[in-house]
Structure formats: C-alpha cells, structure tokens
Amino acid sequence: MKQTSLMLSMIIPGPDSLGNDVDVYLQPLIDEVLQLWKGVETFDASSKMEFPLRAALLWTINDFPALAYLYGWSTGGTYACPSCGPAAKSFHLKKGNKMCYMGHRRWLPQHHQYRRQRKLFDGTVETGLAPETMSGTTVLGMLEGKEFVLGKKVPTTKQSNKDVEVESVKKRKRSSGEKKNQTKGSSGKEKKPEDWLKKRSIFFKLPYWEHNKLRHNLDVMHLEKNVCENFIGTLLDILGKTKDGLNARLDLVQLGVRENLHPIVDSEGKQSIPDAPFTMTRAQKEILCSVIQNLRTPDGYASNISRCVNMKDCTLNGLKSHDDHVLLQDILPVALRSCYPSKEVMKIVVQLANFFKMLCSKVVDLSELDKLQESIVMTLCDMERIFVPSFFTVSVHLMVHLVEEVKLGGPVQYRWMYPMERYAAAFYFNYHFLFLTTYI
C-alpha cells in the first residue's frame, strides 16, 4: 500500500473485486520474492564490493476478509477461524440465523469448574483440549488431489456480459420453510473442513512458506473495532447493532440454558424479554452518552468523539477504528463507572481494556504473555456466562489467538492495518482529485 504500489490497490475496487483471483496479479510479486530468496548481486557502497542480497517474506498484513483471498481459507461459516481450522467449534443459531463461535472452555485447565457447568454456557460439558494452530504442512495435505481454476465466469454466446453481471448480483430468495445451513453445499451434501479451502495460495510457491509459523496476521485494528462495536451496540441497545433481542433469547430457549433470560409470555400472548446483566435503563444510557459527549482529550490523543453521540436516541454512530481503540481501552471503563452497570459487565470491560492495552504496548514482556493468554481465556468464558450466544461473532473468538501471534511476530505495531490505512488515504485523495478535475 505504499506510493509505489498504489496501482495494485486500484485494480481491486467495488463489489466486482478480484477475490480469490488476486493470485493472478500477485504473480510478478512472487517472482521477485523468489529471485530475492535465491540472491541478487548487490553493490555495497562502503566496501566497494558486490555481495548476494537475499530476502524472505515473513508474513502478510491484511484485514480479515482479505485474509480469505490471500490464504484461500473461507472466513465464513462453520470453520471460519483460520487458526483453529477443522478444530473450530461453532453452531448455527436457528432463530437469529447466524453462526455462534463459543467453546472457549477448551483453553481452560482440564479440571476447571467451568468445564462441567452446562446451564451457564452452551448446555454441554467441555472435555476437549485447545486446538493447535493449523500449520502450512496441514494446509498442503488438505489440498492434495485438488485442482483449482482461477478466473471469473465467462459468458456464453447466448448470454451477454450484462446478463452475467445481473446474475452475479441477484440474490437467491428463500421460501418461508427453507432454513439456512452453513455446513451444506449447493448439492445438499455435508461440507467437510477441507471444503473451506477455495484455492492453493500462490504464496506456497515460496519454498519456505509452508514452514512459516505465522503466515497471515490477524488484524488487531479491525478486531478491536468489531469487539468494541459489539459492546456499545449491545449495551446501548442500538437498532441494527445490538446482539440482544427476542430472537437471541429464543435461541437460549432452544439451547435449554439460562432460564432467567428466556422470553416471558403475558396473558395476551405477547412476548417480552427480561432484563439481562448487560441491560441498561434509559437513565443509564443518558449518563454514559453524556460522559462521552462532554469528554475532552489532549490534542492528538483522539478525534472529536462527541460528534458521534446522539443524545436523543442515546446512540453512538460513525465511530472510526481509532475511536473504538481509544473508547475500549481508556474511555469506556471510566464512563461505565458513572452509570453503575452490573459488576459482571464492569469486570469484563475492564479486563478487555487491560488485555488490549498490554497487547498493543510498544514493549512486550515475554514473561507476561502466558498470564495475558490466561486472562483473555477467562474473560471469554465469563462473557459466555453473561452475554447471549449471538454476541460471539468470529471477531470475538479470534481474540483467543492474538497472544500467540504476538509470541511469533512481536508487537502488533508492525503487523496491524493502521499504517496501511494511512497509506490508502493518499490513494483516496488522488482518486477524488482526479474525479473533480474531470468536471471542472
């Protein structure tokens, strides 16, 4: 995403993005990286001599959707977690019609009391162990005997290009009795874990790529943003962003867990949902929003977050990634104290703030990383006890793998998307400048 490589970014616009076909445009890059691996004669100005310069590609920096295009592993559905792979644990919520990624008790010690508590979690006793991160050798083993053809659908003589575009955009309509099943293909057969591999990544042409421990980074910037928006949307009960609701409570009924949160049916047959530990009253929401609206920060510390506050509806909208970064780590733990939420929710928010603070610190203490991993596992398990299953999107689950990536790749400042987004600003400016000059 540097200035010299902006042309590569310009070929991936809009809904007709390259997707898995991006390997076609990455081929020149791979050829150069292979050449650097073998060695390139380079002149040393200090010694006045030539030497063979060698270089290797450590990893890729990308957001989560782009990881699917570079890796080839689909980041949606049952096995959406690229680290867990076939060992991912998830299930489909029938009423909410979405996937739930729980099962974090597997990372707890074998005799921890949470493993035996059915009713407080997903209704099962957890006996499994934490899965190992899927290696490059495992991925290549799953690709054996498979052939993939890159390229878009070519229109036939009877079908124009316009018809193909309309067909690709048109969505299939479901009948009222048809249910979405994330684990079945178009033929109705049960999907296998290896079906989540959509291609053989072009990076495996590099002789060392199979043995790299960390190949594609999980983007801490967007994961932190998604987690923060889950909390804000659920606590403030923002329409379209909250993870709680009638369907979420009906999923608890189907799972047979946490009867105190099940919907209540009155004498007229109307359903209402009881207050949960994370439910806030109108007065509490107003206090929280007023604290954020009246907040004043040092120059350069954060943007004007007060512009995102709507006091009439008690909502927060239009937050940028860095706004969520500051909110989750520094503002939200303090602001929530003023509106007196439940102790369980307050504890979770403080633990998450401390987790991301230590994770994003410039200096990493290796002796503290094991404790940090234990703390995020306990926090995720406490979240499973309090929040509804629909809260646990794949971004929430991926937090359990972030400490391991710090051990392998070092501080997140060298591996997240903030620098890339800043480089992209130049591209957006040039694009709009050219657009305006066309009509002036």
Residue ranges and their predicted role:
Residues 1-278, 317, 344-346, 350-420, ...:
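Domain-level cores of phosphate- or acyl-group-handling catalytic modules
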Residues 1-2, 263, 280-284, 293-307, ...:
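Helix-boundary capping/turn motifs
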Residues 313-314:
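Boundary/linker elements of alpha-helical solenoid repeat scaffolds
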Residues 335-336:
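Plant-skewed but cross-kingdom recognition/interaction modules and surfaces
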